[in-house]
Amino acid sequence: PNNGSQRPHTIILVIGESAARPYMKAFNESMSDDTTPWLTQAKSDANMLLFNNAFACAHATVPSLEHALTEANYYNNKEFNETLSILDIAKKAGYKTYWFSNQSKIGPYDTPITIVAETADIALWSKETQYDDVLLPYLKQINKDDNNFIVFHLYGSHIYYHHRYPQTYQKWTDPGEQGKVADYKNSLLFTDNVLKEIYNYGREKLNMDAMIYLSDHGSTPGIVRNPDTVMRIVFHIPLFVYLSPSYQNEHQLVAQTLKNNTQQYFTNDLLYNLVCGVLDVESNHYDESESLASPKYRFDLTNLKTNMGTESLKDNLKYK
């Protein structure tokens, strides 16, 4: 690739589903329940960067990912069908691209996501929705001597939460409405394990240089998701970026900038530009002013928007 690295390496992006940062121990040290034991421990590694002020641009999967995966966002008014995607930019940078999804390919609801996914060199969907670890064996077909860009699209904590994890992950139980919250925590616990497996395999077998995880949007367990009464928690999402020591050595400015920006505010429709930054590409399809990985990043609480561009993030946060 033209990004300064001559050695074969892999970059992994994991897209979560309905994971809400306020329910994740790694982002909330005062939480008594450790819903993220792997990440809680992994964040003590200086190469693992957690971003505490990441938010979803929308409260539903399609409008969120239609923007996260492409140049189009709620700030530049570009149209989805006129933009490059993260897979396009990775291909231009010399990567073999993979898309592994545990979200159904059929139905009108995922069309823009499927359009992007199908441009991968290899795109695989699980046969039917199963537990997310069904995707892990797909990693075995990847050649560590290639430059690989891999996207995982998890089913994560999609309702109904108790269908998202095997019984062995049922750590919390509660009656009634609180039962949904317990099930939700269990689903996050299982996702944490899936992330651990991807991370370990990438590091041990694929020369992993970077791993990014974020969610499409959050969730409000026990609360009906309605656009008019949507609880603010639905916009609070996790974001982490792992950078290997060799990556940091070769891309010192990007690495230092991301370390400096862990407290910066970010909405996930800016994911495309973050990925461009991590790939360290030079392209007229990369707006550095919209990249959390660039010193030119121009966003903060005063000019970010959520709820499909209709609400200032600053106003939204008043209703925590």
Which residue stretches match the model-derived regions?
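Membrane-interface soluble catalytic domains
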Residues: 88, 105-106, 200-205, 221, ...
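Short glycine/proline-rich turn/loop motifs
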Residues: 67, 172-180, 251-257
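A long, amphipathic alpha-helix that forms part
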Residues: 1-2, 136-140, 172-214, 241-243, ...
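Active-site-proximal alpha/beta segments of enzymes that process anionic O-linked groups
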Residues: 1-13, 18-172, 267-268, 273-298
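DG-centered beta-turn motif at the end of beta-strands
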Residues: 15-19, 212-218
